[in-house]
């Protein structure tokens, strides 16, 4: 397959916001270059997962190799490295951009520039990529190509005199795009003589061959049967199978600098072949790895419990299998007095959490309850020890801790001007710190806030969408930890603390959250034979309380008239029974109560 010189190889990716037509554009390119036969074509060809096709988002990266005969009569090899467009997967995006020399910036001609487009463009510029702007969906009745072109020049700072106007759905402008990739994207550096260095930009688990690693050769050459070393995990493997993605796997004997392919080497788990790691030869290793590798760190944690306790082992197997494919997922066993056995799982962000939960329910037929998502807090104890805590129940007592720090993020919201007020109001209620506001055009604004991550993980995104009728888009990045006035809010039902309902909140909000929780639980916990107190407490101080009245039998029904002392005796006897029942009775907190707490409007 190495019949084409390096000068005729082009590696590029497509940058676009969700729904701007990236997958459709990739489909048309595969069709026009006859990479995929007409009869095999289906929509969103590169999105393999059922969930991706349904939500119309790209979760796992895909790659495809296309052969294209340009107008100059030469045959070129175009390697498309697809990227996920969502903020949770920005590390994966940065790695796949590092494997390219150019990028197509696809913008919807009716929507304009969105927040995630912007974030990914900056990543591409950091990697020194050549950016080719493309206006997509120009066939739509609401398309405003001139306004959007001006916006791209204004916001992104690209020269758009030769912007390509295309409609992936109608197949317009596809040849212009292919031609401009050949003309504008620089070829890879010709470094075949140097020691092997290749960048892993994706990997997935195949039950028969082990982990399949997608990589781009940066320097040198790799052959089937070579012994290779992964520089971050320090493990060595022998390559059993080497090939290119066209887009189905086609085996080859060797790949040289500039090419994109895959290999299998009986690797047991995706954790051993992390995205961003460098592959080098075990015999003549390269002196230094490629820059930019970091471990994917989970940012959001929550408990996953099976509704049926018998499914615990199934849940463990399912998580083990998902983990083979998803190195960013972490989990450890957890027990809760209210929910039984389950797992504490860590995710990159909220979308990642939702996708994992949905895949567990859909692919493994599990019925799950999730506890409220929490973030990683940093606690300094009075002894000077620093602890990282992702579960409110691990928080030390107030007298033992010196300070609690929480992660802060910078949120960029791009919105039509009419919604600026409501978005600023939302950010202020979430303890946001206003940083900056820029006007792109008369009608579009970029608002920048700094917010605690904990305020964003619950329902910030849903609120943003509903307040702006879906027009606003957001993008966030972590900016570090800051000290906060944080307390642990415990919920006591019948004087017993329910660990799954505990949460870490800001002191100023504790009363309102506690009050709302108590009222919500009063509605949801069924009445028992005895009176149940529901209390919200910080340490030993009760800050809010509600009571669920007892169900009681009318013991006076059989007394007609007669002496008052007779009635008193019966009532006192009943009260005594209720008192005894209360001391030994247990209260069942239904699952709806846990779910409702997640949806408490902060």
UniProtKB/Swiss-Prot annotation:
UniProt: GTP binding residues: 19-24, 136-139
Coiled coil stretches, renumbered: none
Reactions the enzyme catalyzes: GTP + H2O = GDP + phosphate + H(+)
Cell location: Cell inner membrane
PROSITE patterns membership: G_TR_1, G_TR_2
Record InterPro entries: EF-4, EFG_III/V, EFG_V-like, EFTu-like_2, G_TR_CS, GUFP, LepA_C_sf, LepA_CTD
GO molecular function: GTP binding; GTPase activity; ribosome binding
SMART domains (UniProt xref): EFG_C
UniProt keywords, alphabetically: Cell inner membrane, Cell membrane, GTP-binding, Hydrolase, Membrane, Nucleotide-binding, Protein biosynthesis
Domain of life: Bacteria
GO cellular component: plasma membrane
PANTHER family: TRANSLATION FACTOR GUF1 HOMOLOG, CHLOROPLASTIC, TRANSLATION FACTOR GUF1-RELATED
Known function: Required for accurate and efficient protein synthesis under certain stress conditions. May act as a fidelity factor of the translation reaction, by catalyzing a one-codon backward translocation of tRNAs on improperly translocated ribosomes. Back-translocation proceeds from a post-translocation (POST) complex to a pre-translocation (PRE) complex, thus giving elongation factor G a second chance to translocate the tRNAs correctly. Binds to ribosomes in a GTP-dependent manner.
Annotated protein name in UniProt: Elongation factor 4
